[in-house]
Amino acid sequence: EAPLVPQEELQSITQSLLASGADIVEMNTIRKRLSAVKGGRFAQHCAPAKVFSIVLSDIIGDPLDMIASGPAYPDSSTCADARRIAEQYGLRLSPEASQCLERETPKVLDNVETLITGSVRELCAAASAACRELGYEPVLLTDSLDCEAREAGAFLAAVARAHQDTERSLAFLAGGETVVHLTGSGLGGRNQELALSAAAGIAGLEDTAVFSLGSDGTDGPTDAAGGFVDGGTKERLARQGVRIFEVLKNNDAYHALAACGGLLHTGATGTNVNDVAVLLIRR
C-alpha cells in the first residue's frame, strides 16, 4: 500500500465507513482514491510492462476494479461517486484527502491480464461438499447474500421453522457478505451478529443449528471467525441474564457468544472469499 494521506487518517476514514454500514464497494471507491497504487494506478505505473494479475475475489459478483480496490484494473467509479459517498456517510476529511477524491483514476488500461482463482462460489461449493460428506443434503440459498446481518439471521431462522417437518438432514447455505449498522458500543462482527440473531428465531427447535464465519478467519475487530448457535442458545443465555435483543441493540454479540461457548476460532486462513452462513437441520 502507498497511501496519499497519513496512515492514521486512512484508518479513521475506514473505521467511519465500517461503523456507518457502508458496503465494500462504497469503501473501496473512497480508499482507491486515497492510494497511489489502487484504482488501476499500480498497472498505470508499470506501463508499458505487462501485468498478469491473479485474483482471489472477496466481493460479490467479482467486480475486478473493486477487489483489493483494483490496483491492476481500470476503475469504473468516478470522483462524483466518491463525493456522494463521502457526503452520504458524513466523512470528515482533511483538505489533502478531499483533494484526493477529486483526482480521477485510470479508466483504460491495455497492459493487464487477469485470472480469478477463487470466489464465494468456490467457498459455497466446498461447504456444500463438506455438508454432504457429513450426511446433510445441501441447499444453496444464495451466493450473493448482501443485507443487514441480523436480517440474514432472522431469515435463516424462518427457513429453519419452515422445514421442521423434513425427514432428511438438510444444510441450507448462504454465501456473501452482510453489513452491520452500529447502534451500540459492544464488540462483535457481522457473522457473530448473524448467528446471534438466528439464535432468537430457532429457540426451542431441536437438532437445529446455525453457524456463520468469515473465510479469512476474522470477524470484525475480534479474535473470532464467527459464531455458532442452536435451539438452546437463547435459553442458556437467559439463564445467565443475557437477553439477545438487548445484546444485538448494543452490537455486543462477541461477549454473548463467549458466554455460551458459541464463538468460532479458526485463526488466520490466508485467504478471503467472503463469508458463509449455514443452517443445519439434523434428522
Please place each PLM-identified region on the residue numbering.
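Short Gly/Thr/Asp-enriched flexible loops that form oxyanion-binding sites at enzyme active sites
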Residues: 1-10, 184-191
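Internal gly/pro-rich beta-alpha loop/helix module
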Residues: 3-95, 101
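Alpha/propeptide regions of enzymes that mature by internal proteolysis
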Residues: 4-24, 137-139, 201, 235-238, ...
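General beta-strand structural signal in soluble alpha/beta enzymes
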Residues: 24-29, 56, 67, 75, ...
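Solvent-exposed alpha-helices and their adjacent loops that cap or buttress functional pockets
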Residues: 35, 43-49, 58-59, 65-67, ...
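Accessory alpha-helical/coil subdomains and C-terminal extensions
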Residues: 49-52, 74-155, 164
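Active-site segments that bind and position negatively charged phosphate/pyrophosphate groups
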Residues: 135-212, 220-221
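Internal helix-turn-beta structural module
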Residues: 196-283
